[in-house]
Amino acid sequence: MPHAESIPLLAGLPFIVLLLLIAIMPLAFPHVWEKNKNKAIIAAIVSLPILVYLLANFPTELAHSLKDYMSFMALLASLFIISGGILMTGDVKATPVVNTAFLAVGAVIANVIGTTGASMLLIRPMLRTNSERKHTGHIPVFFIFIVSNIGGCLTPLGDPPLFLGYLKGVPFTWTLRLFPEWLATLAIVLTVFFVWDTFAHRKETKRDLRRDETGIVPIRIKGLINALFLAGVVLVVCFQTPAPWRELIMVLMAAGSLIVTPKTLRKQNRFTFYPITEVAVLFAGIFVTMVPLIMLLHLKGAELGVTQPWQFFWWTGGVSSFLDNAPTYLAFHSLAQSVTENLGTGGLAVISGVRVDLLRAISCGAVFMGANTYIGNGPNFMVKAIAEEQKVKVPHFFGYMAYSGLILIPTFIIITLIFFS
């Protein structure tokens, strides 16, 4: 078998091409891209040459990546299916305090059912709560910031990058040590939201505010049987059940949810398999094409000059802003392993082959900065689509980046100075 040093740099090109297509196609050719069949064809075409190359030269590395893919999809699909069986209805008074509390609760829930599950569970109730108000365009934006991204930083269940880290050997409870970064970032962004929403609330007419008060309906949650299935998934990950039993139990939990949850409830929740199918076909291509790049990064990563925690935070986050944050995490995790091997530990602990200060920076960068654009993390576009469906005026792609540039970038600079300088 060829040695890793024989891998040509061009072998990393399909990975970059595929991620660029994921970023560009929804904007350039939305009608083509909206069909999962077309996504699957594109992913297959781009990844096929690398698949053949790896089968011929590095079958073991390919097998490891495909094993990670199966574990990754088992977790994502089970959380998506189970959370889709929980329906939250009702309409409470849409004050800045209530909205801020809604987002804070969503940030906590994201660590249990994932950012995708939390987003799908909570976005419609939050929009319904604010439906009588007119000045609400900022609400989906902050929802994406907090619930769809930053919130899911404390467990491997929270966001796909952290689960991939767990598969690479990061202990399940280690991510709880990111609590200071998580709390500080949330505190800043929630404070900005509260101030922003307070000004927006003052612009509402008295008529709309009266409509909001008279339209109050108590919050009700249906499908709570699914909490048992969620607990099953959490426990099987938390207690580090080995593969393939871990994945089998996740599949059984999802199947149980599908069987016992009334179809009418999922219909009310507008549940479909479209989003998870999209993730499955695209990530099949990603997990194949990223193998050579990760091998190259591990081999030559120290030559890139990225060695400090703040560099890893911004490089991981910057790439995660425009490409998907899960494979970005893996790429920089591999780079950090190379840096740790070549430059030493500096007396710091090592987790899954990575110096702990670098691992903190990579984890926070991947999770937090997936919020910088609509394409940084899977739930972002889904939240945007649901908001538009409910006639909420949300910013376009670059308008959203103006929000993130104004709010998130200064926040991340502060976080860098406190934790990663």
Regions picked out by a protein language model, each given a short descriptive name:
Residues 50-68, 80-95, 108-121, 291-300, ...:
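Transmembrane alpha-helix boundary signature
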Residues 232-340:
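Transmembrane helical segments that form the transport core of multi-pass membrane transport proteins
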Residues 14-28, 43-54, 72-86, 123-127, ...:
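Central hydrophobic cores of alpha-helical transmembrane segments in multi-pass inner-membrane proteins
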Residues 189-240, 247-250:
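Long, contiguous bundles of hydrophobic transmembrane helices that form the permeation core
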Residues 21-42, 64, 90, 220, ...:
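Flexible hinge motifs at transmembrane-helix junctions and intramembrane kinks/re-entrant loops
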Residues 5-19, 64-77, 110-119, 178-188, ...:
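Structural signature of hydrophobic alpha-helical transmembrane segments
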Residues 32, 154-155, 164, 173-214, ...:
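Juxtamembrane and boundary regions of transmembrane helices in multi-pass small-molecule transporters
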Residues 110, 121-134, 139-141, 147, ...:
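Membrane-interfacial helix-loop connectors
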